[in-house]
Each structure stands twice: as structure tokens, then as C-alpha cells.
From Swiss-Prot:
Transferase listed as a keyword: no
Protein name: Phosphoglucosamine mutase
InterPro entries membership: A-D-PHexomutase_a/b/a-I, A-D-PHexomutase_a/b/a-I/II/III, A-D-PHexomutase_a/b/a-II, A-D-PHexomutase_a/b/a-III, A-D-PHexomutase_C, A-D-PHexomutase_C_sf, Alpha-D-phosphohexomutase_SF, GlmM_bact
Tagged with keyword Metal-binding: yes
Cofactor note as given: Binds 1 Mg(2+) ion per subunit.
Cofactor(s), by name: Mg(2+)
Annotated GO MF terms: magnesium ion binding; phosphoglucosamine mutase activity; phosphomannomutase activity
Gene that produces this protein: glmM
Origin superkingdom: Bacteria
Amino acid sequence: MSQRKYFGTDGIRGHVGLSNINPEFVLKLGWAVGCVLANGARKKVVIGKDTRVSGYMLESALEAGLSAAGVDVALLGPMPTPGIAYLTQTLRANAGIVISASHNLFEDNGIKFFSADGGKLPDSVELAIEAQLEKQLQTVPSAKLGKATRINDAAGRYIEFCKSTIPSLSRLSNLKIVVDCANGATYHIAPNVFSELGADVVPIGIKPDGFNINQECGSTAPELLREKVIAVGADIGIGLDGDGDRVILVDSLGNLVDGDQIIYIIAKDRHQRGVLHGGVVGTLMSNYGLELAITSLGVPFQRSKVGDRYVLEMLREKDWKIGGETSGHIVCLDKTTTGDGIVAALQVLSIMVKQNKALHELTAGIQLLPQTLVNLKTNNAALLASNPDVIQAVKNLEKHLNGEGRVLLRPSGTEPLLRVMVEGANASIVKQQAQMLCDDISQIDKKMTESLPST
């Protein structure tokens, strides 16, 4: 595959005003996308965004660039990422564009894309866009300029879709739900989804001001949600991130329920009903307890690289339906085309109602193992991960764990770090073993550095 200059694993992201998240680049990006998609024909693209103040600026730049390429634009306004994927399909658009930096704070923003079927753009299209970006911008003749329209009922359309992902007879009328919208794109959607299904909803994180997205709230900061669940005596808390593609839960006792546990609940229910369709996909970072719980059901479990993009790729490759990440990216391909926090939460709520069980009862079948993650500073992360002495040290520790734990080394793709993760049955022992392994690796790193020729 050709080397990418602009696209990362999930679009283009960065600090607003720095790197490529600026009006000049984004306008040309819109033009390049338009040229590649249109290829001389009239096309339509939908654009949605989260609640960051920079979203207005970037939306205008994209709109101008797309229009210059002769592409019509449908503006959705604030809309969860999975909602944009859904509306790309239903509006028969040729692509969907998301302006969001997901769970990051407001200073960051990003651009990512969906194809006409609501999936990720193929690599070939991303590479074609990159090639187009190297050319000089040329505006189509005035008679062929693209037009922009606003889809005023976008939120209502997506709300109805979310409700349709659980059985039509499902009622949430006996449930009290706290939902934290992270002052993000779900603020005007998630509370309505749950209340229209009959739940008693206590919403928080629903007052976005352009600057408070993900700020001490949402799926990455669940303490406020936990406190509210206990304070109001709720049955469940639902924590979404700024663009609505992640979800974590809190049970009535105040316990955090992460993505691994949510995957288990959904997969077990589908397996018991005979509608799971194959196995379950986690990632290299998924807790070993999830693997044990899933395989104990007689269900296959596979790990992809970290990132919802890779979970989706493996699900499609195997024609499986359920997968996700510990962070709360939950993919139900029998319902959606991408990770969807609201839809994942609805699956769990439907199971609670159908089985007449509390959330803590549904998580009883999965025992998460204590996990220690150490970020080891090194300039030789990739070399260390493949070093024979390091590999032997890992094998020695795995032998000591005796099949009741796991060791994982991951070089960071963005920082001079080697991430060392150890899982096992005993938290204090796992922590001790992780530190001992890191000490061994540090010694190997030191010897390696000393042996390298100086520059």
C-alpha cells in the first residue's frame, strides 16, 4: 500500500490551527474529495459535526471546497458519527463527512469519511484523494457549482432508526436511566431516544457551548455519571463520548461496565437466541476475561489490531456481526455499519427488560482479569518488541502465568513508548510482574542503545 501523507487510521485529526486542521487545507480537502467522488458526474455528500466551536469553520471550508468541485452538500448540523453513517445511506449520498475529534477535548478536531454504504472509505479512494490534494485547485464552471441544503429533520430520522434496532414491543417504562451526552453530538438525540421508548430519563452533559465537549464528562470521564446514578437511584447510567460512537455503562450499584462487558452481554444474548452469526471480535487490548467468557459459551473469539477500523475489517472478513473495544466502540453489524453508542446501549436495555435482570446480574458471567499497563519510555520500541531476549522474557512470564493471563507488547505509533500490558488473576502479582518485565526490557534497551553506532 502506498504511504499516506494525510490520512491516519480514522481520517485526519489534529490541533485546530496547527497541522492540517485549518480552513485553507480543509477547503482544498473538500475540493479533492469532490473531484474524486464526482469524476465528472453530479454527486451529493452529507456533512455532520459534533459540538466543537471549530466545527462551524471547518464545515464552511468543506462546503466551499465541495461546491468548487461541483458536488452538492446536505448539511446535517450536530449529529453523532453513526448517525451520519446512517443518513449517508438513507439520503442516497455518495459519501458522508464527519467533523469531529471523537473523545478529545475541544482544541482538537478532525475529518473522517463514510462511503455510500455507511462504511469506511476504501483505501484506494483515500489514496486517490491524497493524490488530488497535490494538484492545483480548479473551480468548475459557475453553471456546475454545487449547492448546499440543510436537512432540518436529520435528528428525528436518526432517533427513529435507533429505536428500530430493538424489538418493536420493547418498552423501557420501568427503567430509570441517567444518560451523559458529554456535551457532544448526542445531546439532542440520546435523551429523546430513551424517553420515547418510555424510560424515565435523567440527562446530563446536554449543554454544549463549543468548548465543554468531553470536559470531565462522557465515556472517558465517568465519575459524574456514577455519582448521578447513585444519587437518583437509577437502574443504569449510559455514558457516551463527544461524537456518540463510544459507550460505557454504570450499573445501579455504581460499578463501571466497560466495552468488554457490554460485548459479552450482547454476544451471549444473541448466542442464546441462535442469532449471533459466527464469533466475536475483540482487539489485542481486550481483557483476557472477555476471551475466556466468550469461548466458555462455545463461541469463537478473535483479536484484531487496536482500532474500530480493524474490528470492522475482521468482522467483514469473517462475516461475523459482533465486536468492539474495551473503550466502548461496540459494533453490531446486524444493526449498523459502524460503532454506535446509542444502539449498543439499546441492545443492553432490551436484554435487561426481556430477561428482567439488573445490569449487574448480566455482567456476572464475565470476570475481568486485573490488568497493568506500563508505558516504557524508549526510542527503540519497535526493535525491542522483536528483540529475541525480550521475546524470551515475555515467554518466561507467560509460562509463569500458566494460561491464566496474558502479556502484550505494543510500540506506540505516535510517541517514543513501548506499551507493556500484563494480565493475570492476582492484581498485586500482576503489577509486580509487569514492573519486573519492564526492568528486564529497560536493561536490554540500555545494552541495545550502547551497541548502536552513535550519530
